[in-house]
From Swiss-Prot:
Function: Required for the export of heme to the periplasm for the biogenesis of c-type cytochromes.
GO biological process entries: cytochrome complex assembly
Protein name: Heme exporter protein C
One CC-aspect GO term: plasma membrane
InterPro entries linked to this entry: Tumour_necrosis_fac-like_dom
Recorded topology in the membrane: Multi-pass membrane protein
Keywords tagged on the record: Cell inner membrane, Cell membrane, Cytochrome c-type biogenesis, Membrane, Transmembrane, Transmembrane helix, Transport
Family to which the UniProt record says this protein belongs: Belongs to the CcmC/CycZ/HelC family.
Residues annotated as transmembrane: 30-50
Signal peptide span: none
Amino acid sequence: IKYSVEWWNTLHQGATFTLTEKPAMPVEMWAPLLLMVLGFYCFFGAVLLLRMRLEVLKREARTSWVKAEVQTSLGARG
């Protein structure tokens, strides 16, 4: 499969981003694309950490430190 992509490269687009060469697309296109990719990674990381925190709190729901955390969280809201 690797050689078929190299031999008949009209069927497949080459790499748009490489670390060693200038991007194949104009700056007006790749700068927002890169910004959105970085933004997505940050969003994904934040959601992943929140879900991990929730899972730990669910598993440890009967412990005293979770009850204290919930009380602190509810007290901070209002």
